[in-house]
């Protein structure tokens, strides 16, 4: 499949693509520049597409990105804050749940919201295609 994202409506190439997204961002402030309005418009569309993809893949819970690999201190702190926000738990409780979950954010969230252990949380995630919201039901 060939897809096209263009700020040039009715371009010749759009006639041969399977999916065409055309943005009419109007003329650039500086003629010949493609990094101002049209580049910004394309970036916004790509951000929307990637956000929708993350939601459909179950990598979010509410407005939180919860499918996070903790590989450094900064990401560890982010994971703690995500668990806190998702559950309303204290920082200490979020840290404990993350530790007991093997540093899996989704597992820690389920552990705290459902008051279950890590193994049961993982089982519920597997049964719900790794989606936190569905695993809660």
Briefly describe each language-model feature range:
Residues 7-63:
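Short alpha-helices
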């Amino acid at each position: 499949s060939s897809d096209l994202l263009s700020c040039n409506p009715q371009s010749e190439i759009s006639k041969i693509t399977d999916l065409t997204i055309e943005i009419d961002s109007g003329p650039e402030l500086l003629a010949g520049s493609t990094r101002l309005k049209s580049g910004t418009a394309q970036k916004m569309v790509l951000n929307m597409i990637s956000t929708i993809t993350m939601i459909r893949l179950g990598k979010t819970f509410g407005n939180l990105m919860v499918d996070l690999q903790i590989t450094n201190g900064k990401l560890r702190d982010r994971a703690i804050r995500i668990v806190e926000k998702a559950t309303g738990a204290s920082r200490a409780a979020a840290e404990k749940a993350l530790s007991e979950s093997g540093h899996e954010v989704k597992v820690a969230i389920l552990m705290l919201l459902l008051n279950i252990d890590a193994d049961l949380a993982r089982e519920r995630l597997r049964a719900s295609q790794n989606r936190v919201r569905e695993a809660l039901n």
